Amino acid sequence: MTYTVVWQHQATTEFRRLRQLDPAGAKECASVVRALAEEPRPPGARQLGGSAYWRLSLGDWRILYQPEDDTITVIVLKVGRIP
């Protein structure tokens, strides 16, 4: 089952800003986010406490997202990079 990936405005804005600083990392990050459509809970992703939020680390990049099984959606909440 393929999920629909939805980017929240804050995540899109931050991704665009970080893409200017690290184009190669941004390309890999975008690829990983697209892959969440096929596997919303990949190996290496961690659930944050008992919440519905998940974090995925990719080198210096972090992706905070929320898979919603009832609507078959993955909502990308925030994208960040470790300084």
What is each model feature region?
Residues 12, 27-30:
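Generic alpha-helical structural signal
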Residues 1-6, 16-26, 56-62, 66-83:
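Enriched for short, Lys/Arg-rich terminal
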Residues 31-57:
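A short, surface-exposed loop/turn module that caps and links secondary-structure elements
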Residues 14-17, 32-35, 47, 75-78:
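Residue-level recognition of specific faces of alpha-helices
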